[in-house]
Regions:
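A compositional/biophysical signature of low hydrophobicity enriched in polar/charged and small residues
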Residues: 1-165
C-alpha cells in the first residue's frame, strides 16, 4: 500500500517538528505555497492521525529528574484494571502493553531517589494483579519519542493538488 503522505506533507511536518508554533502563513511563506493549502494539509494530517499538535512537557523543568523503566507481568484477568491504575497514577509517564513474560512496561518519573524508593517498595507492590519482573534506573534519555520522525520513503505518495486535500 502506498503511503498517503507526499513530500509536501513531509516538508510541513519537518517545519512543525522543529517548531510546532510555526503559523500556517509562515509555513506557506517558507514553502512558497498558498496559506489555505497549508491549513488544509495540516488539518488533514491531524485528522489522519499523522501528527498531534500538543505541548510536550519536560519533566526535568518541574524537578522530575529520576526516570525508571519498570517491567511487569500482569495476570490476564487483571490486565484492564492494572492498566487503568497506572493511567491514573501521577508518577507514571508511559504505559505500554507488550508480548512475553514482561508484558507491561511503564516509565515513572520522580523528583528524588527517596520518592522512587517509596514507589518501588510500597506503592507498586500494593497494586494487585501484576508482578514486577524488573526495573531499570534511566540516568539519561538519549532520544525521546518527540524526536522520532518517519523515514523519507514514508512520503512517497503522488503530490496531491489542492482539490484532493
Amino acid at each position: 500500500m502506498k503511503p498517503p503522505f507526499d513530500q509536501f506533507d513531509h516538508q510541513i511536518i519537518q517545519i512543525l517538528h522543529k517548531d510546532a508554533r510555526t503559523s500556517a502563513s509562515e509555513i506557506a511563506r517558507l514553502l512558497n505555497a498558498n496559506e489555505r493549502t497549508i491549513r488544509k494539509r495540516i488539518d488533514r494530517l491531524v485528522k489522519l492521525g499523522a501528527v498531534r499538535l500538543t505541548a510536550i512537557v519536560d519533566p526535568e523543568a518541574f524537578g522530575y529528574v529520576t526516570a525508571v523503566d519498570i517491567f511487569l507481568e500482569v495476570e490476564p484477568e487483571h490486565e484492564d484494571e492494572v492498566i487503568q491504575t497506572f493511567l491514573t497514577t501521577p508518577e507514571v509517564s508511559y504505559v505500554a502493553l507488550g508480548q512475553g513474560n514482561r508484558d507491561l512496561s511503564i516509565e515513572c518519573r520522580f523528583k528524588t531517589n527517596d520518592d522512587m524508593r517509596e514507589f518501588l517498595r510500597k506503592k507498586l507492590p500494593a497494586i494487585s494483579g501484576g508482578t514486577v519482573r524488573g526495573y531499570s534506573l534511566v540516568p539519561r534519555i538519549i532520544r525521546n519519542i518527540d524526536a522520532w520522525m518517519p523515514r523519507d520513503d514514508d512520503f512517497r505518495a503522488e503530490t496531491n493538488n489542492e482539490e484532493d486535500i
